[in-house]
Structures are given as C-alpha cells and as structure tokens.
C-alpha cells in the first residue's frame, strides 16, 4: 500500500500546482472578468437572472458559484435543468455564464446561442481558443471570454502523468477555485472601490488562491496509516457505492460519485430517483464539512440499519456523525479533511439542522471545505485507479 500512499500524495501535490497556476493568470483579464460580473450585479433593476451553462463536472464547479451569488446577492440562479427559453424575459436582467473546457459541448453551445439570440449578456470560461463556444462568445458584442488553460478530457498531451491526473480533473478544479476566489473581488466593486480596473491589484483574489493552495498542501500530510486503512475498506468491494451531501458539499459528492462509475463501480447519487435502498455489501459515503448535516446524519442511520458500511468524509471530529461512528466502533472509517486551525472553529460551530433547510451559517460560510474535499476526492480517484488496475484509456471508455 506504500505505492498507493505515494500516489495519493503525488496526486494532491499535482492539484496544488493546478491551484497555484491561478495566481499566474493575467490580472488584467481577472480584473475584466470581475468588473463584468460586478457591472451586471450592480446594474439597475432587481430582477437579475444568472444562467449556469455547463455539463458534467464543469457544471458542478459552476453551480457552486451560483450558490454563492444566490446566498449573498439578490440573484436568481438558473441551471441547464432550467432552459433559457423557459426563464428568459427581456424585462429581466439576464446573464449567462458558460463553462466548457473544450468549447464543444453541444448542449452548452445551444444555450449560449439561445442567450445571444435573446440579447442577454454572456460570459465564457474555457480552455480552448479554437472551440465553438469561444467563437460564439468572442464574436458577440455583449460577451467576454476568460481562458484557463487546464487539461480537459479531450487533451492528448502525452507528457502528463495520466495516473495522477484522471481525465477532466484539472480544468474543473481550476474553475471551481477560480470562481470561489473571484467572488471575493465582487463586493468591493459593488461598493465603489476607487481605482481603474487595470490598476487594481486583485489582492482579495490572490489571497484566496494562496489560501486554497495552503489548504491543499495540508491534505498531503494526512496520516498515511489511517489513509491506508480507509483505502483498504473503500475499494475492494463488489457492493454499490452511494455518495451523498447537501449544498456545495453535495456538488462535490455528485462529482465524486461520477468517478466511481469511471472506476467501473456501481454507484449512485443519494438523492437520485433511481437510487436503491441500502443493503448488506453497500457503502455510503456522506460528504459533510460540519458532520452535523441533517440529511447526511439520517443517511448514516439508514445505511447502518440496513447493514451497509458508512465511510464519511468530514472535517469536524466533534460532530454528531463522528460521535455516532465512535459509538459503533467504526471511527477508522471516517476520513478527516484537514483545514487550517483558524477554520476548525467555523465548522465546529455548525449545529445539526432539523429540516432539509440549510442553516444561515452553512449558506454564508467560506467554501474552504468544498475546495479541500474536491482535491481529496480527486486524489482518492487516482488511488482507486491504481488499486483497481484501471488505465486512463479504460476510464475514458466509461466516461459519458
């Protein structure tokens, strides 16, 4: 198992480099992107609709940002499940934000064309200047494009160590971190900070990127013996994998569940309509920073009652979920995501909710756990690919 721990650490270190790349983006482009968002959000009118146009894990990275906009600002978010034609009204302020690494996702390009055809504003984040999405938005007078040169599933670059960068991971992770970092720049612009766009230093953005990078390095220092036991419990099983989470943690969970499919495992998102009941041999993997999320806690009880294993991912050792796992003698089945000491108190203050409604605390807190959980689960996938003898080519064949 030493080789697997090395793979975990190398995969985590690689993702740290992905995050650190964001600090090297052209600040003029970062400023322009932040200004364009602030211009829309600070414009006249109280009916602001933001359409998130993306697919797969890119969509989950974008939807996390939409939650931030909805929680902190007076914005109504729409996703690809809410077609543009259904919600778009010219009496509203409409902004489409598209994320497409290749720029060739048909459904995304269709909705980009819809928004352009209706005269709405359009922003695109892509890795491909030669893609269709880039051409559509770059040629549009109310559109702008930001290039993040991250690897996508369409890349054929042979110089990368594929086992440490499962296809599609780099671009989606960088988009997730970028959008969470750029959000810190928006309030100052809405409050009328002085200075021309090109002269702004983007200190809040850069501080967030450095913070994400520091947090990422903590993951590579997780207890190797505990990780080894966790891997041994997680991978060698023939039962079904059920992954769950709520809010932004739920978006990370959905991305993680997709990767089990690529590892040729039978997996389900907990809240899908076709998710079966737990049975002996299954494993439930709830992802919850606080460890007190009502839905996850109830999912744990349900799984245990029906004979399934439970392997939570959390950051709060004093949570009710961890207390239950300790009571059952299954404390070794918990994976603890490390965060800086100053953040532990934030998670320990979160109390269990009594309904599906997310607490005010949970909605407003800094999304550091979701960034770390994304990095951790990506590294777990790299370990799983090696443990199960999966080659990247085989994983691609299982990719939608």
Which residue stretches match the model-derived regions?
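A short, well-structured juxtamembrane/interface segment
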Residues: 23-46, 218-237
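Glycine-rich phosphate/diphosphate-binding loops and the adjacent beta-loop-alpha structural elements
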Residues: 41-42, 47-55, 197-211, 217, ...
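A ubiquitous structural signal for well-ordered alpha-helices
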Residues: 15-18, 33-36, 65, 111, ...
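A short, charged, Gly/Pro-tolerant segment at domain boundaries
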Residues: 181, 188-207, 379, 385-400
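Glycine-rich phosphate-binding loops that contact phosphosugars or nucleotide phosphates
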Residues: 38, 42-184, 246, 251-382
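Generic secondary-structure signature for well-ordered alpha-helical cores
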Residues: 13, 17-24, 42, 74-75, ...
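A general structural signal for well-ordered alpha-helical segments in protein cores
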Residues: 5-16, 30, 34, 62, ...
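Generic N-terminal amphipathic, Lys/Arg-enriched alpha-helix
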Residues: 1-25, 198-219
């Amino acid at each position: 198992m030493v080789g697997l721990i090395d793979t975990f650490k190398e995969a985590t270190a690689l993702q740290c480099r992905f995050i650190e790349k964001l600090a090297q983006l052209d600040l003029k482009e970062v400023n322009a992107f932040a200004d364009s968002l602030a211009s829309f959000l600070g414009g006249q009118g109280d009916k602001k609709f933001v359409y998130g146009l993306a697919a797969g894990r890119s969509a989950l990275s974008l939807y996390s940002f939409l939650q931030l906009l909805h929680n902190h600002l007076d914005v109504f978010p729409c996703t690809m499940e809410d077609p543009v034609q259904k919600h778009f009204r010219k009496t509203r302020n409409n902004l489409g934000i598209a994320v497409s690494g290749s720029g060739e996702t048909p459904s995304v390009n269709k909705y980009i064309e819809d928004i352009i055809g209706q005269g709405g504003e359009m922003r695109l984040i892509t890795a491909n200047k030669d893609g269709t999405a880039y051409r559509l938005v770059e040629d549009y007078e109310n559109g702008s494009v930001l290039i993040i040169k991250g690897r996508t599933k369409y890349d054929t670059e042979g110089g990368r160590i594929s086992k440490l960068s499962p296809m599609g991971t780099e671009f989606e992770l960088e988009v997730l971190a970028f959008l969470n970092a750029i959000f810190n720049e928006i309030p100052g612009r809405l409050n009328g900070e002085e200075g021309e766009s090109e002269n702004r230093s983007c200190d809040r953005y850069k501080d967030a990127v450095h913070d994400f990078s520091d947090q990422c390095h903590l993951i590579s220092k997780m207890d190797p013996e505990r990780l080894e036991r966790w891997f041994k419990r997680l991978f060698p099983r023939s039962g079904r994998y059920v992954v769950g989470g709520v809010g932004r943690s739920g978006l990370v969970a959905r991305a993680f569940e997709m990767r089990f499919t690529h590892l040729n495992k039978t997996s389900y998102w907990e809240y899908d309509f076709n998710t079966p009941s737990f049975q002996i041999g299954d494993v439930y993997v709830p992802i919850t920073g606080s460890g007190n999320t009502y839905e996850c806690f109830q999912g744990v009880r349900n799984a245990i009652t029906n004979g399934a294993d439970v392997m939570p991912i959390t950051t709060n050792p004093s949570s009710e979920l961890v207390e239950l796992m300790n009571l059952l003698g299954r404390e070794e089945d918990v994976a603890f995501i490390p965060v800086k000491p100053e953040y532990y108190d934030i998670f320990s203050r979160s109390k269990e909710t009594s309904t599906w409604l997310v607490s005010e605390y949970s909605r407003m807190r800094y999304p550091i756990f979701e960034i770390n959980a994304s990095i951790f689960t990506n590294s777990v996938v790299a370990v799983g690919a090696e443990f199960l003898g999966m080659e990247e080519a085989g994983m691609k064949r299982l990719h939608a």
